[in-house]
Amino acid sequence: HGSGLDHRSWALQSRWFAFHGFSVFAPDLPGHSLSEGNPIKSIEGMGQWLVKALKVAGCESIHLVGHSQGFLVALEAASSLGVKLKTLTAVASALSIPVNDSLVETAKKSPEDGADMLLKWGFGSHSRSGISAVPGMQPIGIGRQIMSSNPLAVDLVACTRYINGIECAKNIQI
């Protein structure tokens, strides 16, 4: 999942894949929503945690999908999965994600304000009304609640410090 987010980011996609024959594993990183423990402060550490979680879950044929920070974590994990890795998919990501200093500082001082900044940028000007084309859904409100209760600043700093994307990508053989 992306910075400050959790498994709910993948609710609709998880459902689709599950109904099309895939076993879906969409974990919350430690310190995020339903996961216990302290937040992991580096993308490398998050990738190692994911590899261990996949092993504990008994995953053998692995298709990794990651959004933003989640792709960096998936990339780290993918570089050490070997033949178990079947595909790796990036959604709105890159091999490095330097985060604006103002956003990081805002998220450190006020997770709510940091979440608001990300949501405004992510959803654009039409998000100001807070409505959704999907009945019963309020992605801005839901996103604000999730991000402000998770370690957003820790995640943003981890993204900023991550520099191993190219090397990890070179190690992946699918």
Describe the predicted segments one by one.
Residues 98, 105-171:
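Conserved alpha/beta-hydrolase catalytic His-Asp/Glu region
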Residues 58-61, 83, 173-174:
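Active-site acidic short loop of glycosyltransferases
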Residues 11-19, 23-69:
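Active-site loop/oxyanion-hole signature of alpha/beta-hydrolase fold enzymes
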Residues 5-8, 49, 91:
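Anionic, Ser/Thr-rich low-complexity intrinsically disordered regions
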Residues 72-116:
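Flexible "cap/lid" loop of the alpha/beta hydrolase fold
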Residues 4, 29-33, 95:
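Alpha/beta-hydrolase active-site loop signature
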Residues 2-5, 68:
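Active-site glycine-rich loops that stabilize anionic/oxyanionic intermediates
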Residues 18, 171-174:
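Conserved loop-alpha-helix segment in the C-terminal half of the alpha/beta-hydrolase fold
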